[in-house]
Design a protein with these regions (language model features):
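Catalytic cores of DNA base-excision repair glycosylases
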Residues: 2-9, 13-239, 247-263
Length: 264
């Protein structure tokens, strides 16, 4: 199958629909990793605010690694599962102390870190390092399903992976950057309408076009076999657990080395 018409369409729509989000103005893998985790369960508009607040509080992977558990959980409140915050801290500790603050770029090393699955690993690789890979995220699924599987129900990921892999461009021949490890910042790097056909610009186009499709057509990602509907928060165990954590934090009873409580 000739994928060039599909790629041209996605690139064109990506330019038209580009979202100038704050985590797109950095190549710092810590900042990009944080955005990937926050976006797993929270709307983009809310993440825009909370991402900045988090980085004001924990500006680098070292700052997060050295922070207390209670402080991390307090900063995470209202952002979904507390275990994601605990995994962020645990992974930050490994990156800071086992990797001297330098993020690994290989998928097998990234997924070995707490809380980092294949999609998050590929997001870090694409957006921080411009490396090619299979970034199979819900908006990416939406685009592929809408155009290439328009009438097919329950499409398994194994059928999507080869297409996502084939359409992702190769990385640049050279990638030069310098990281201020202490400050955790690489400076501004905006890529709207990026002329280079790179993994980073390609997946931005896929994400933005997919988000647009979800608002304008019946959600194609529901036809993915991997699709799961988020359970209601009201009256759920997640709500009870979040309330317990808030109470413990307010009372100062969630100390160092303590995990957030379980609700069964």
């Amino acid at each position: 199958m000739d994928m060039n018409p599909f790629r041209t369409l996605v690139r064109t729509e990506g330019v038209r629909l580009y979202r100038d989000l704050p985590w797109r103005r950095t190549r710092d893998p810590y900042e990009i990793w944080l955005s990937e985790v926050m976006l797993q369960q929270t709307q983009v508009a809310r993440v825009e605010t909370r991402w900045v607040e988090w980085l004001d509080r924990f500006p680098s992977v070292f700052a997060l690694a050295e922070a207390g558990t209670a402080e991390v959980l307090a900063a995470w409140q209202g952002m979904g599962y507390n275990r994601r915050a605990l995994a962020l801290k645990a992974a930050a500790e490994q990156i800071a102390f086992d990797y001297d603050g330098v993020f690994p770029t290989e998928v097998k090393e990234l997924v070995a870190l707490p809380g980092i699955g294949p999609a998050t690993a590929q997001g870090i690789r694409a957006f921080a390092f411009d490396l090619p890979g299979v970034y199979l995220e819900t908006n990416v699924r939406t685009v592929v399903l809408h155009h290439l599987f328009p009438d097919v129900p329950s499409v398994p990921d194994k059928e999507l992976v080869p297409i996502v892999e084939a359409t992702c461009p190769a990385g640049l021949d050279s990638f030069e950057t310098s990281i201020d490890v202490d400050g955790g910042s690489l400076g501004a790097y905006a890529v709207p309408q990026d002329e280079d056909d790179t993994p980073r610009s390609w997946y931005y186009a896929m994400l933005d076009y997919g988000a647009h499709l979800k608002k304008t057509v019946p959600n194609p990602s529901r036809r993915a076999k991997a699709y799961t509907r988020q359970s209601k928060f009201e009256g759920s165990r997640r709500q009870k657990r979040a309330e317990i954590v808030r109470m413990l934090l307010a009372a100062g009873e969630l100390g160092e080395g303590m995990d957030a409580p379980s609700v069964h």
